């Protein structure tokens, strides 16, 4: 165990496509020649659109093997609902070469039977189908040569609100939200040395990580406010 994240990995997987859109620094943790797997519903054109230039350059210049898998739709198809974990675990074993693929699939199916047999063979079969789907639905992406020189215009989102709150969001919350908090200098926290943060910052914490979003129907809403209580952002 280590107190720090691994930053020279043979295999890194992004299980939520919103992290690609937000440009989280994930692929940079893959060592040259390693594997990067993205769980998404995109074809190559959409992937090319959503991947940021710095990620493209790193992939191309470091010979990173790029794969995608649509575990989101596969989970629904095999009856697992929104549970993609079993599919993605099978995809990991199919790519990472920790165990021979067939052997890993057998072990996973044995574990699924042991864990879910009390819930019935139907549940076990769904997990077996998820394992087979994850091991066989990988898409290898041929990395274009021009990714090595990919560029894009810098985009700075306009934020409205109290000046001090916007400054805190821009200088601290956004880097931390992009998993770049370790890069912040001590000087960034001078105005917050006593631990006090500006109020109203939750309004800027739009993570956007859900694949599906419920639609509010005013005609049937009972105004219980439980939706806002459960998800204040």
Where do the protein language model's features map onto the residues?
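Beta-sheet entry/capping signal
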Residues: 12, 35, 213, 228-230
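Conserved oxyanion/phosphate-binding beta-strand-loop segments in alpha/beta enzyme cores
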Residues: 178-198
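Broad hydrophobic/π-residue packing in well-ordered secondary structure
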Residues: 75, 143, 186, 209-212, ...
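Iron-sulfur cluster-binding cysteine motifs and their immediate structural context
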Residues: 201-202, 226-233
């Amino acid at each position: 165990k280590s107190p720090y994240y691994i930053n020279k990995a043979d295999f890194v997987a992004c299980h939520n496509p919103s992290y690609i859109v937000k440009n989280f620094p994930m692929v940079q943790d893959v060592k040259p020649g390693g594997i990067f797997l993205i769980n998404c519903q995109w074809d190559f054109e959409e992937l090319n659109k959503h991947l940021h230039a710095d990620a493209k350059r790193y992939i191309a210049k470091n010979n990173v093997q790029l794969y995608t898998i649509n575990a989101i739709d596969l989970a629904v198809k095999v009856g697992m609902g929104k549970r993609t974990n079993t599919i993605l675990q099978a995809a990991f074993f199919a790519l990472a070469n920790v165990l021979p693929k067939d052997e890993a699939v057998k072990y996973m199916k044995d574990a699924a039977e042991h864990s879910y047999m009390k819930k019935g063979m139907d549940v076990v079969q769904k997990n077996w189908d998820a394992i087979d789907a994850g091991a066989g639905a990988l898409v290898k992406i041929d990395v274009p040569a021009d990714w090595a020189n990919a560029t894009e215009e810098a985009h700075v989102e306009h934020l409205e609100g109290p000046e001090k709150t916007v400054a805190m969001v821009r200088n601290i919350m956004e880097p931390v939200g992009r998993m770049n908090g370790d890069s912040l200098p001590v000087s960034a926290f001078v105005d917050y040395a006593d631990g006090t943060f500006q109020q109203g910052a939750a309004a800027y914490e739009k993570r956007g990580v859900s694949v599906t979003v419920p639609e509010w129907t005013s005609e049937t809403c009972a105004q219980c406010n439980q939706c806002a209580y459960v998800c204040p952002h």
